[in-house]
From Swiss-Prot:
Protein's UniProt name: Formyl-CoA:oxalate CoA-transferase
Superkingdom field: Bacteria
Protein purpose: Involved in the catabolism of oxalate and in the adapatation to low pH via the induction of the oxalate-dependent acid tolerance response (ATR). Catalyzes the transfer of the CoA moiety from formyl-CoA to oxalate.
BP term (GO), one: oxalate catabolic process
Any one Pfam family match given in the protein's UniProt record, by short name: CoA_transf_3
InterPro entries: CoA-transferase_III_domain (IPR050483), CoA-Trfase_fam_III (IPR003673), CoA-Trfase_III_dom3_sf (IPR044855), CoA-Trfase_III_dom_1_sf (IPR023606), Formyl_CoA_transfer (IPR017659)
Assembly behavior: Homodimer.
UniProt keywords, alphabetically: Transferase
Keyword hit for Secreted: no
Catalytic activities: formyl-CoA + oxalate = oxalyl-CoA + formate
Amino-acid positions noted as binding substrate in the UniProt annotation, renumbered to this chain: G247, G248, Q249
Xref: SUPFAM superfamilies: CoA-transferase family III (CaiB/BaiF)
Entry similarity comment: Belongs to the CoA-transferase III family. Frc subfamily.
Length: 425
């Protein structure tokens, strides 16, 4: 079956997480992604957080499925020739270097356009133009500078970062959408363009409900936040609100049966207005249906702590799955707190390809996330990540059309091997 991005060729200069997230998604949709790596070492994540000595780490394998790997010394004159040929033969160049690195390699935007006017150059940076544009950014820095950390945590505690990689992986997903959009526009214009996604911008985009709340503060307190019911004044910035729902419907994480020994024996419970009477029936507080302190959403706002304390008395008598079954039967919105172990073992996620088992020649079988986006006419087959330089000769021959003699010359030039160290005189 034809894949959605069949015929699109990506020159992948990305490393670590943000860029590889982007290019892996494009590869899952069928693009031919050629990952260019430093001879001898490759992507730094091959050796980071290794659980098995001398094999590619899960950090690398889970971000580089469905790609081809070539090694290339871009400082070598022959290596520059190969890179020029690749730029001429590809549709998109993706990079997440530090500011100015691509220019210092001799491949400015103008130079790339001269080589291939249809080339799309896609970049992930830490910040957009401004006072911080030259700063180095990693996941947690992005969360802190994009508004996520200041609004995550409890009101009386420090800012917290989330376990979800919204800075790295989130920005990679944003960039992938930008690339596909640029490819579509190129069909009409015939021209390439630059696509940039800044990590600060990506985090702020995912934190947009907090920017919403920042503006609401000018008109009064945020009544769905716990501190309103506790009578605590609001300041001039959106506060941290613990596990309060961000969607305007009061919600909290509540203990379930077994919480004393199971750190994930919890459920998220939302007191949605249309099912309030059903909630009252479930927890045995039928009198709350008509009580003036509880009967209407505005009246309940000042009593949320008491309401959730009573609901928690009920949830603590049930496992999180028992509670979920009961609540779902009444359309009461809730969700169990699922551990990574539970997710890895969930047969429904295996069946949909959301969690996949991949076989690797040196590390054996391992689990990975699959494509979270399902296309009916372009199903994803997750293939293992490449070994370092595994496809170098294949790409030189099939993509660039070099013959055996030319490939041998490139090898002899040292363009595909680690730079030789000069012996001390």
């Amino acid at each position: 079956m034809t894949k959605a991005l069949d015929g699109v060729r990506i020159l992948d200069f990305t490393h670590v997480q943000s860029g590889p997230t982007c290019t892996q998604l494009l590869a899952w949709f069928g693009a031919d992604v050629i990952k260019v790596e430093r001879p001898g070492t490759g992507d730094i994540t091959r050796g980071q957080l290794q659980d098995i000595p001398k094999v590619d780490s899960l950090y690398f394998t889970m971000l580089n499925h469905n790609k081809r790997s070539i090694t290339l010394d871009t400082k070598n004159p022959k290596g520059k020739e190969v890179l020029t040929a690749l730029i001429r033969s590809c549709d998109v160049l993706v990079e997440n270097f530090g500011p100015g690195v691509l220019d210092r390699m001799g491949f400015t935007w103008d130079k790339i356009q001269e080589i291939n006017p249809r080339m799309i150059v896609a970049s992930i940076k830490g910040f957009g133009p401004g006072p911080y544009e030259d700063c180095k950014v990693y996941e947690n820095v992005a969360q802190c500078t994009g508004g996520a950390a200041s609004t995550t945590g409890f009101r009386d505690g420090p800012p917290l970062v989330t376990g979800a990689q919204i800075g790295d992986s989130g920005t990679g997903l944003h960039l992938a959408l930008g690339i596909v959009t640029a490819l579509y526009q190129r069909q009409h214009t015939g021209r390439g363009q630059r696509v940039t996604a800044a990590m600060q911008d990506g985090v702020l985009n995912l934190s947009r409900v907090k920017l919403r709340d920042q503006q609401r503060l000018a008109h009064g307190p945020l009544k769905e936040y716990s501190q309103f019911g506790e009578g605590i004044p609001f300041g001039d910035a959106v506060p941290r609100a613990g596990n309060d729902s961000g969607g305007g419907q009061p919600g909290r994480i509540l203990k379930c049966k077994g919480w004393e020994t199971d750190p994930n024996a919890y459920i998220y419970f939302i007191t949605q207005a249309p099912v309030w009477e059903k909630i009252c029936d479930v927890i045995g507080e039928t009198g709350w249906k008509t009580h003036p302190d509880y009967a209407t959403p505005p009246a309940r706002l000042k009593h949320l702590n008491d309401i959730f304390a009573r609901i928690e008395q009920w949830t603590m008598t049930k496992t999180k799955f028992e509670a979920m079954d009961i609540l779902n039967s009444d359309d009461i919105p809730c969700g169990p707190i699922l551990s990574m172990k539970e997710l890895a073992e969930d047969p429904s996620l295996r069946a949909t390809g959301t969690v996949v088992e991949v076989d690797h020649p040196t590390r054996g079988k391992y689990l990975s996330v699959g494509n979270p986006i399902k296309l009916s006419d372009s199903p994803t087959e997750v293939k293992r990540s490449p070994l370092l330089g595994e496809h170098t000769d294949e790409v030189l021959r099939e993509v660039l059309g070099f013959n055996d003699h030319q490939i041998a010359e490139i090898h002899d030039s040292g363009a595909l091997a680690p730079p030789r160290k000069q012996a001390a005189e």
